[in-house]
Amino acid sequence: MSRLSQLLNSKKAKQKPPSEHPIGLSSILKQDSSSSSDSPNFFPSSSTNDHQERDTINDTNFVVPEKQKTSKLALLAAERKKLHSSFPSTQQQPPKTEKEKEKEPIQAKHKKNVENDFLLQRFRKVRIAEKKDSEQPSSHEIHLTDDDDKTTLQKQMVESDQLKKNPQEVKLAPPSSFAKCLTGAKKRVFEDQIEIHLSKSSLLGFNAPSPDDIVLMAQSKSKSFQKHKRLDEQLLNSVKSMKKVSQQLKPQKNTNDSNNDHTLLSQDQLIELSKLVKPRTKLLLLGPPKSGKKTLLSRLFFQIGSFDPKTMQKCTVLNAKKESLSSVLKSTKTKWYDFETFSNSYSSTIIDFPLGIFTTNASSRDNFLKHSSLFQVMNTAIFTIDCLNPLEGLDGISSILQLMNGLSISSYMFAITKMDEIEWDENKFINLVNSIQSFLKESCGIIEKSKFIPISGLKGTNLTSISQEKLSQWYKSDTLLGKIDKEADTNHGTWNFLLNLPLSLTISHITPLPENQSHIYCSIHSGMLQDSQKLYVGTGRLETQITGLSSDENPKGFNVAGDMIQAKIPTLPNLCPGILIADSIDAFTSSKTAYVNATWFHGSLEKGKSMHVIALFGCHAVLTKLYCFTDSQEKAPNAIGNDLERNRTSLVKIELENAFPLVKESYINTLSRVLFVSEKWNSLIAFGTVLSLHD
């Protein structure tokens, strides 16, 4: 007899009504099927009769032999019982004590289980629908088992109960995968990497800076820039304190005036304060079109930290926006671009110069005057040569080198651009340098190989650091910035000498203002300038006073040689660009006659043609007579044509139509440079330096 039959017989013996305790197998299966029909068939639900039968079986003390066989129905019942017990139910067993009334009814818990089963089935349906819709399933998809589903559901139910009880103590988390599935939202496939296209980058459109460049930029910002910013503030405070002391030392009638801006410092005080001012060197960037001038200029500015990111975003070479560099960097009317080097902390100025300005097809008089006067103030020239087209533009470079030699400008260098496109090949670089040297040898003499620098303006290589393995294996000289700093060292003594000279500045641009006033843009060539200072304008020495002085430099209370300033002056007769302004009547000698060491362009001298002489950064006068000294004899221009063909450098005597300021070479070289221009202002005839003056 089976164990189940023995159990039934024992129950009948006790004469208990079967309606109250249905313990038969048929009744057990019937109740299971009826209870399961009310709920989804995925999970078997528990019922009250099951609990009663388990209690009844546990109450019996009958022991079944181990080897006793069981029927198929008994195995099925045990299997369903095992399946039911494998899912831990959240409902609590009804205690046998009196606290049973306080617990939730079993039917409510049964309904809750039915709802959970329904949600889980919907979860699976959504998952299956997503797999069918997506062609490439996500690698991050997590396949949960039934146990995981049940556990996840229980955790979310507990969290929702806590949120209802203590809504302020529970922190809300992002939506879970389960919540997204319930709402029908499709999951997006995660990307392992995020690619940012260079053309859409907010900072640069070319390659990112190297680690060396990042360090150098950090140094320039943190050390040099901050250091000199403090020095500029200290200098401005010193100027204000000196003016305040000078104001207090004035007579009693002027002490009530609290404005110290119009108080002038003495020359000794200015010289002492000028020791805190950074030296200034002026660079000229020259090269044929498409040789990489603006790319070089922009990348150099970026690497030394002169640009803020907002300005960088506007440049053509830095992003996809088609804006020219000159339209972005509008610092002054003359388009000089200021920057500072971090090694020696010099303040430098650079300009992009057109090579064709000295050809017969040059532009108008004003444009020629503006560009030709740059050679009278420049210290260093940088020529850009495309390594892919090295011979392009060498004719213009040859003419400018002749001009620089005649003006005693020996500081220049050649930047061989786009070297990254030939993979920094040493042999190609050497052959390129040899071809340039041989081309310029006849007209300009031998050029040292140390003046040639291989660079890449696009990638920034060899501008501030080499940071390229192949280049560092054979190039052992300085970077472009290192050579600029060395040239600034050589020009430092000249700059100090300029500060001790009388004040001289020339007007580059004039804008009329109401009330008989004019707004002027000027370049200071020597001396130092203060606001409300008394000045003398032009050869007529008209007295005036400058007001509203400002500059693009950091405010320091005064301006020195090399600065470009803006100011207001009363409108005067014959006030025009190029006119000289000085602080003393006898500061510069005006003369009609001078001896000049001149260098002539080939075939530029024409018989019977008049010329203009440009001196002192824009001042000019008509040349009436010219005498050349060859073979120790004075000859007229029409008698020395053949001699000029043989000897292009000669001593000349000039006689001008009207007297204008000229400076001897012994005074200072940059102030003594003169240019000879054709009558139509379209070609350069000769250039040189003034050796002596005669009344």
UniProtKB/Swiss-Prot annotation:
One of its GO terms (biological process) is translation. GO terms for molecular function: GTP binding; GTPase activity. It is found in: Cytoplasm; Nucleus. It comes from the Eukaryota. Residues 32-47 have a biased composition (Low complexity). Residues 1-112, 242-262 are annotated as: Disordered. InterPro entries: P-loop_NTPase (IPR027417), T_Tr_GTP-bd_dom (IPR000795), TRAFAC_GTPase_members (IPR050100). Keywords: Cytoplasm, GTP-binding, Nucleotide-binding, Nucleus. This is Uncharacterized GTP-binding protein P8A3.05. It comes from Schizosaccharomyces pombe (strain 972 / ATCC 24843).
